C-alpha cells in the first residue's frame, strides 16, 4: 500500500492540444478515489499517466516515496483492472491468475497460496479450471480483479471496469469492489462516467471537466455543496435544477414568482439558483410558493419525478408515490436548501447558511 501524489500534472498532444491541466491530488494510503466526469474530461488519460501508459507532459506522479515519471509500468507496483477484462482466452482461470506471478519468478508455493486466497475472496473456486469463454461477464470481471489482487500491489487502478456489464450485475459488482477494497486496504483510483457508481464507491470524488478539476470532496459533501453549476448538474440523479433568477434585496425572483429568503440572500443581482428535486414540498394554504405547471410524471416506485415549468423554465421535483399531483400546484422549498451560483462564472456563491455553518464549526473548535 502507498500514498499517491499527483502534482501539477499536464498532458499535451500534438498540435498543442492540452487534455489535462495542472492537476493536483494527494491520495492517502488506503484511500478509494474516484475520478468522475463526462467523456473527454481527461479522467482516463490521468489514470493512464499514473499507470505509466501515457507520458507526463508536465508535473510529477509519486507512488509511495518514488517519483515514477520515468519508471516503466511494470515497475510502478500497481495493478490495473480494465473494462475489457484483458484475460488470456486459451488459459484457464487458474492460469490467468498465476500468469503475472510466474513472470515475476514468484515461488510456486507463494503463487498457490495467493491464487487460493483470491479465488476464495472472489468466489471463483468452482471455476478455476474453466476457460474465460465458459464464464459470465461478472465472473470474467472477478477473474480480472483476482489477477490484480494476487499481485498485492501498492495501488489498484480501475479503468471503467463495469461498463460492459448489465445494470443488475453492475450493482452487485459495485458492492463487491467496495467490500474487497475495504478488506484489503489497498490505495485505489477508479475511473467512471457514472455518477451513481462514483457516489457509492468513493471515499472522495474528483470531478473533472475539460481536463481540469472542478471539485474534490467526500460524495455527500460534493452532492450537498457543489462548487459549480457543472458539478451540480453532473452529480445527482435527477440532476440539480438550475434556473435563471434575480436577487432583489432579500427576495428571489424566478420569472413571475417572488420568494422571500428570510435573510439567506448571499448577494444581489442576477444569479443561477440550484434546487434539488427532493427538497421541494407542496405549499400550504397561504404559504409563499412557486406556481408550478406539470408537464409529465415518471413513476419510479419509491418516488414520483414530476417534470414541469416555473414560468418559462424547466423544473423537476420528487414527491413520495402517494402524493396526488394536480395539473397545476404551488410548491415551496426552504431558503437554506437553495444553492446560488454566479451567472457569469458558474462558481458557487457561499450563502448565509454555509457562513453560519463555518462560524459554528470555528466556535466549536475554539
Swiss-Prot record:
UniProt domain ABC transporter: residue ranges: 4-235
Lipid bilayer topology: Peripheral membrane protein
SMART domains xrefs: AAA
Chief location category: membrane
Recorded catalytic activity of this chain's protein: sn-glycerol 3-phosphate(out) + ATP + H2O = sn-glycerol 3-phosphate(in) + ADP + phosphate + H(+)
Top EC class, one word: translocase
E.C. code: 7.6.2.10
Cellular component per GO, a single term: ATP-binding cassette (ABC) transporter complex, substrate-binding subunit-containing
CDD domains assigned: ABC_MalK_N
Compartmental location: Cell inner membrane
Annotated keywords: ATP-binding, Cell inner membrane, Cell membrane, Membrane, Nucleotide-binding, Sugar transport, Translocase, Transport
Gene Ontology BP, a term: glycerophosphodiester transmembrane transport
Record keyword Chaperone present: no
Residues that, per the record, bind ATP: 37-44
Alphabetized GO MF terms: ABC-type glycerol-3-phosphate transporter activity; ATP binding; ATP hydrolysis activity
NCBIfam families: PRK11650.1
Complexes and interactors: The complex is composed of two ATP-binding proteins (UgpC), two transmembrane proteins (UgpA and UgpE) and a solute-binding protein (UgpB).
Family that this chain belongs to: Belongs to the ABC transporter superfamily. sn-glycerol-3-phosphate importer (TC 3.A.1.1.3) family.
Function summary: Part of the ABC transporter complex UgpBAEC involved in sn-glycerol-3-phosphate (G3P) import. Responsible for energy coupling to the transport system.
Name listed for the protein in its UniProt record: sn-glycerol-3-phosphate import ATP-binding protein UgpC 1
Source organism of this protein record: Agrobacterium fabrum (strain C58 / ATCC 33970) (Agrobacterium tumefaciens (strain C58))
Native organism taxonomy: Bacteria, Pseudomonadati, Pseudomonadota, Alphaproteobacteria, Hyphomicrobiales
